[in-house]
Amino acid sequence: MGVMLQAFYWDCPRAENCEHHWWGLIKSRLPLIAQAGFTALWLPPVNKAAGWKSMGYDPYDYYDLGEFDQKGGVPTWFGSKADLVDLIESAHAAGLQVYADLVFNHNSGGDAQELNPIDGRSRWTRFEPKSAKFPRDWKCFHPSRYETWDGATFGDMPDLCHRAPLVYTELISYARWLLEEIGFDGFRYDMVKGYGGWMVRSIQELRALRDGTTFKPYAVGECWDSERTIGDWLDEANAWSDNPVGAFDFPLRWRLRDLCDSYGFRLRDLAERGVLMWDRPAQAVTFVENHDVVRDSPIINDKLLAYAFILTHEGYPCVFWQDYFNWNLAQPDNQSGIDALIKVHEQNAAGPMQVLFVDNDLYVMQRLGAGDQNGLALVLNNRGSWNGTWVQTRWNNTRLVPAAWAGRDDLNMPHEKWTNESGWADLWAPPRGYGVYIPA
């Protein structure tokens, strides 16, 4: 399915000394990104926000992508509209799709207060953007005559009423504009618990037209909750849809944090249901860090264990920018980093998953392969010394070659193995590490 790169982190323009030039920085890294095997970029919100130096999750003018002088300046914190379009075109030329982050739950930075006659309260709900597109007043927000409340608010920011005909039609028109005019290929929906899944479904059923060709947008939703709640949201958003949306696998992320940081974590817990990857693999977007969890609950130790897991199992894996570029986990010149795992994912990680062995300290899984991808075997080792076991793989009389590996204080390459006539082989991994074997 490919590998997504989250191409930002919180306050990245300030941290990288490229305020209002983040799009240009991403463009400069495109050769490395494409060479590594990434297939898509997830960008931060591109709209003009309430604050000039804002990550965009407080949207003010959806159609101002860095073109109008308002809220402190012309460009967004990430750059100008021209820079954004140039980045998208360059990404397409490099073979990458680009996903926009849609913040459709709330707005911020209103130009004037208004009295809402339904509850008699004044709010900043008058929006007069310089783009002159999608101006809003109190009738666009909760409470309205169409709906008093729809899920969850975000702080004290005005909460959009998607049942209001103007809001519904404008948001769909905006999504189509991003696809057809700006060049995006899909969306990440922010805070989907704040509004009805039917709104997402309406957008996903769009057939965008670009360069004479129609296409369906990809999409993933941020439903930060339990597996059951995420599943309920997916059922609602995808009911009768011919273009289903996926969801970030937050329950799996918490397991991966415990795998990396909790002493005594039982590897057998990785094989338990209750995460999207096992229960709804076609809709699971797996991840290790993102711009939110890394600030409040980061993974501190042995993070490559988590990346080895998501880049060998089913789901659509998403790699975090800081892990790849800032914290030296790419390791492009050896087999002990994210780059080697991406290569394995793109060349071998296909077909159903099958756990061959699991106990508290050892986990062995194989992918059965599909088409021209021949599958793989993953060994995770929780011990402080080399560890392995005999397992029966799908390959008979086949040489299994280590393609990616890493261990704590031990980067020695696992030995090549041969399966016998019944597919049995003795597969090992380094101390507190992993080994990925592929058929030669």
Question: What label would you give each PLM region?
Answer:
Residues 1-154, 193-221:
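Acidic/aromatic-lined carbohydrate-recognition and catalytic surfaces
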Residues 6, 109-170, 236-263, 328-348:
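Glycan-binding loop/region signatures in secreted carbohydrate-active enzymes
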Residues 16, 45, 70, 74, ...:
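A near-ubiquitous, low-amplitude feature marking generic local secondary-structure context
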Residues 19, 77-84, 164, 168, ...:
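Solvent-exposed, acidic/flexible segments
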Residues 28-31, 38, 47, 52, ...:
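Active-site-proximal helices and loops of the catalytic beta/alpha 8
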